[in-house]
Amino acid sequence: MSVIPMVVEQTSRGERSYDIYSRLLKERVIFLSGEVEDRMANLIVAQLLFLESEDPTKDINIYINSPGGSVTAGMAIYDTMQFIKPDIRTLCIGQACSMGAFLLAGGTAGKRAALPNARVMIHQPLGGFRGQASDIQIHAQEILKIKHTLNDRLAFHTGQGIERIEKDTDRDNFMSAEEAQAYGLVDEVLVKR
């Protein structure tokens, strides 16, 4: 059972209590924490759209601590990040692996960061399918298309050549915050506010 801290604020009408995530959302901070899956993606997309409707000129901050997860769920978040008007500041706290790293890199150029002890990992998409040979072939072709799309987007966001991205994502590729900065996944390593 997880406990979510509450924040109590004084207002002109008395006290108002919020869970900590709702309070931070008021400050345009979204937490992307845990496995990237459909339910989480729907919540993140809804928060992004809400914050855009509140003020399309103010940056939105996404704090990422994720081992990765579903490609389709992650692409729903990514496409929304690219679609909406506000700039997206991404910050890796803890880890940004697989789809988490992809979303970290997908923040607005110049506004992507990692904390000093954060870890980032990129790799090719994982797939597994059982069934008839013809269905396995269809799924294999689909995962190759997804791999090409992810590599193309990573090349765009990092400035690396597509050949380098293909080589570097062939296996799990772990990086420190400084290595992620040198690679182009983030723009800076934050040490102090």
From Swiss-Prot:
Keywords: Cytoplasm, Hydrolase, Protease, Serine protease. Belongs to the peptidase S14 family. The lineage of its organism: Bacteria, Pseudomonadati, Pseudomonadota, Gammaproteobacteria, Pasteurellales. GO terms for biological process: protein quality control for misfolded or incompletely synthesized proteins. The active site is at S98 (nucleophile), H123. It comes from Haemophilus influenzae (strain ATCC 51907 / DSM 11121 / KW20 / Rd). This is ATP-dependent Clp protease proteolytic subunit. Its main location: cytoplasm. Its EC number is 3.4.21.92. GO terms for molecular function: ATP-dependent peptidase activity; ATPase binding; serine-type endopeptidase activity. InterPro entries: ClpP, ClpP/crotonase-like_dom_sf, ClpP/TepA, ClpP_His_AS, ClpP_Ser_AS. GO terms for cellular component: cytoplasm; endopeptidase Clp complex. It is found in: Cytoplasm. It catalyses: Hydrolysis of proteins to small peptides in the presence of ATP and magnesium. alpha-casein is the usual test substrate. In the absence of ATP, only oligopeptides shorter than five residues are hydrolyzed (such as succinyl-Leu-Tyr-|-NHMec, and Leu-Tyr-Leu-|-Tyr-Trp, in which cleavage of the -Tyr-|-Leu- and -Tyr-|-Trp bonds also occurs). Fourteen ClpP subunits assemble into 2 heptameric rings which stack back to back to give a disk-like structure with a central cavity, resembling the structure of eukaryotic proteasomes. Cleaves peptides in various proteins in a process that requires ATP hydrolysis. Has a chymotrypsin-like activity. Plays a major role in the degradation of misfolded proteins.
